[in-house]
Swiss-Prot record:
This is 4-hydroxy-tetrahydrodipicolinate reductase. The gene is dapB. PANTHER family: 4-HYDROXY-TETRAHYDRODIPICOLINATE REDUCTASE 1, CHLOROPLASTIC-RELATED, DIHYDRODIPICOLINATE REDUCTASE. It is found in: Cytoplasm. The keyword NAD applies. GO terms for cellular component: cytosol.
Amino acid sequence: MTKVIIAGASGRMGQRVAHMVEAHPELEYAAAFEAAGNPAIGKDIGRIVFGEENGVIVGEGLESVIADGDVIIDFTFHTATMEFARIAAKHGKAMVIGTTGLSVDELAELKDLSASFPCVQAPNMSVCVNVLFKLAKKTAAILGDDYDIEILEAHHNKKKDAPSGTALKLAEMAAEGVGRNLAEVGVYERNGIIGERDPKEIGIQTLRAADIVGEHTIYFAGAGERLEISHRAHSRDHFAKGAATAAAWLVGRENGIYDMFDVLGLQDL
């Protein structure tokens, strides 16, 4: 059995990950931790998550539990994620990162760190969303420059980063499909007298409201018609299930960064 350490164990995603780990035949929930000052520290995580004790006591920080597991699953915050990645690299522990909002510099550091540990890093671990990424690239390549590309994403009002990592990945895949550099053509805000739309630009717009789990639509709009491809999440369980799948797949792999295309066997599609 692969022993799993869950970061932010008492949080919303940490609890959903716990359920998916418990349901996975190859995984064992071995350790949990929270940041200093969290009221869950010192308590049995089973009572918090499952309503009954499972013998896993919430530690203070990753270092306090790093020896207890084989792989860390993290859906916390980008600065915390990088701290955990440095610790994972030091100890040679595998890590699954579902945190979004990592900066260019943080991603570069993560790549360097991955020489010392295997890591799955993905903006979205849903099977359907990763299929959507592939569809975005292939559709953009087929339709070409005659179709405007726009992306709309919606999430709950507690989400800290915008646009979502999923929306950015969608835009990157579409840009690849039409041979563009997203850094040059991405548009994230429109306000005032902006003039006509540049036919090469890719728009990415954001909504934040109430308890929306996550919705993404990519539009390919041409003269007289448009194609919309959408994904709507009804719960966080599909993210958590993907993370559990990634954890089971990752342990024992060579050091380096992998993504969900690797985990799901989608690289060549």
